[in-house]
Regions:
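Active-site acidic carboxylates
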Residues: 1-99, 148, 152-155, 163-188
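Histidine-anchored nucleotide/phosphate-binding helix
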Residues: 35, 137-148
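Internal catalytic-core helix/loop-beta-alpha segment
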Residues: 75-133
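Short active-site-adjacent structural elements
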Residues: 103, 137-141, 162-165
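Glycine-rich anion-binding loop/nest that anchors nucleotide
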Residues: 125-138, 155-160
Length: 188
């Protein structure tokens, strides 16, 4: 069994002070960095929301389900990884959402166009741990797509931050129903 870590959207615009801030995002960035000092994965990847023209994904009157305030514009500080996240151990970054809404890291690709699932398979990965921001949106979508792609999947809940308790609970129920393991802490 070969396992990879997928760090989802730990970016400035999703942390405190950002355009679509999630409470606890900066702390999660630091906790992931601490975890990276002691974990042992065959590969470590990260995703980045990276919008050029996402069309209807952005709205001046967002519903926070299908539409959102503008965020993570390509080549802006908001799209950068949060400074609390140690990016040195990351083997590859997958960019998503350039021209449409993209919640899952599996909708992203490297700068040379390699899709996440393909990249993981070339590394012999069969299991993934997923963490990051937001538990109830992009972490959820990435974990569900990992299962759909055939990877054994676990969400590291203590290394993730979500938008609201109610939507986190709904997301966790959906993940469990899909066969995703929920690890309450990194020792799980």
């Amino acid at each position: 069994m070969s396992t990879a870590l997928i760090i989802v959207d730990v970016q400035n615009d999703f942390c405190e002070g950002g355009l679509v801030a999630v409470a606890g995002g900066a702390a999660v960035a630091e906790q992931i960095s601490e975890y990276l000092r002691v974990c042992d994965y065959a590969a470590i990847t990260a995703t980045r929301d990276y919008h050029i023209d996402p069309r209807a994904h952005f709205s001046d009157n967002p519903n926070f389900v299908d539409t959102w305030p503008p965020h993570c514009w390509a080549d802006t500080p908001g799209a950068d990884f949060h400074p609390n996240l140690d990016t040195a151990p990351i083997d590859e970054v997958f960019f998503k959402g350039a021209y449409s809404a993209a919640y899952s890291g599996f909708q992203g690709a490297t700068k040379d166009g390699t899709a996440l699932a393909d990249w993981l398979r070339t590394k012999g990965i069969d299991t993934v741990d997923v963490c990051g921001i937001a538990t109830d949106h992009c972490v959820r979508a990435t974990a569900l797509d990992a299962r759909t792609a055939g990877f054994d999947t676990r969400v590291l809940l203590s290394l993730s931050a979500g938008v609201s308790p109610a939507s986190i609970d709904r997301a966790l129920d959906e993940l469990r129903e899909a066969g995703v393991e929920i690890a309450g802490n990194i020792e799980s």
